[in-house]
Amino acid sequence: HKPSQDEINELCWLYGDATLEDAQQLQGFYVGPRREMITPWSTNAVEITQNMSLNGISRIEEYFPVDSENAEHDPMLQRMYNGIGQDVFTVNHQPEPIKYVDDLEKYNEEEGLALSEDEIAYLHKLEKENGRPLTDSEIFGFAQINSEHCRHKIFGGQFIIDGKEMESSLFNMIKKTTNENPNKILSAYKDNVAFSQGPVIEQFAPADQTTSDFFQVKDIESVISLKAETHNFPTTVEPFNGAATGTGGEIRDRMGGGVGSWPIAGTACYMTAYPRLKDDNGKSDVERDWEDIMPVRKWLYQTPEQILIKASNGASDFGNKFGQPLITGSVLTFEHEENGEKYAYDKVIMLAGGVGYGKKRDYKKGEPQKGNKVVVVGGDNYRIGLGGGSVSSVDTGRYSNGIELNAVQRANPEMQKRAYNLVRALVENDENPVVSIHDHGSAGHLNCLSELVEECGGEIDMSKLPIGDKTLSAKEIIANE
């Protein structure tokens, strides 16, 4: 409906004393969200208008005027508009149909799937058994959930050195200490987090989580959760969002421990090549003679200095918006050359970690049974983080800039906080209805949901997944992150 003058006045107030432009078309260049992508900002803004009883508004977006069409922007989330009109939200693109892939080897390289020769041979075998070529969705999905990132094939594999088979895998060596001396460790190396025995503590929570209610204090037997994981590839390619989603991912892992638990505080560690700090005139800001031992490389995406600044900003930004402080961390810069061999953190290391707690009642996952419902909580699906599992499993720079940028997730701490509020409410209840819970991250729905029903199997109706971008293909729906 056409807004009334009162509604226009309320909107002008809401937008910070803005004025209504009485025009059908705005001239000039603008940077704004892609038309097929409803932003988290829009979701929150529309909800505010609904709470103000301003009905009929389905989308609100921000567009920023820029000087030219060459202005910097994030092509994954934004696009350049030469003028803005009434059709700014109109999408005329249809989803790509499911395709049969005739050349596995070529498709593997084009899509950045990082499939090995053995894996391609296995897929050829499946083609013969099925009597047809595999689809792009099947191959893409297999590459994500079978990637090194998701399956730890190197760490869990058997090593043969100088013709001799080693007694243990790297993973078993890591687990050995805990197996022989568990002490207070209750769960490790088999869930999203590790849990150790905690003290009896007071829980201060609403008596009824479904409505406004008084708070009450209860004694609960607690467990302490610990988690750390690297987010190296995304931070090398796009440091702000790479580090932000690193922090966000390890927070989700603590939320998804057992059948739900609470994050408390985080840490972030950064390792890069020498930053070679410069002042505004391009001269060395600090005397660092040792940084000159190796020539400066032509960096693929960002310099070490840019990575340290942007990654630190990204990790802190997510923690601040979510409500988890980063309370400690470390920085290491290193380069070395010896006997013609060069060593440096050209592919950076970003380690996100944290501590949390939960109820001892909830530290073990249950086994889903027939009839249990699969529930997906959080934001809608968009063309973001495609192929992150497979692309992050190989050397950065192996694939094109487009593939690697597409594989980096984008942060949405506000939506994650909403999902956390639900998890917290369920865990604080006297009865937690959750049987098993996993976080949705690398390799998308296919990896998350297959882990969820790993022991029993399950049926997922793809049409019921929360799809925000109606132009997503089947491949993109099952694998977006």
For each predicted feature, which ranges?
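Short catalytic-loop micro-motif centered on adjacent basic/acidic residues
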Residues: 435-438
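Core nucleic-acid recognition elements
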Residues: 1-396, 401-415, 419, 423-431, ...
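Anionic-ligand anchoring segments at beta-strand to alpha-helix junctions in alpha/beta enzyme folds, i.e.
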Residues: 453-475
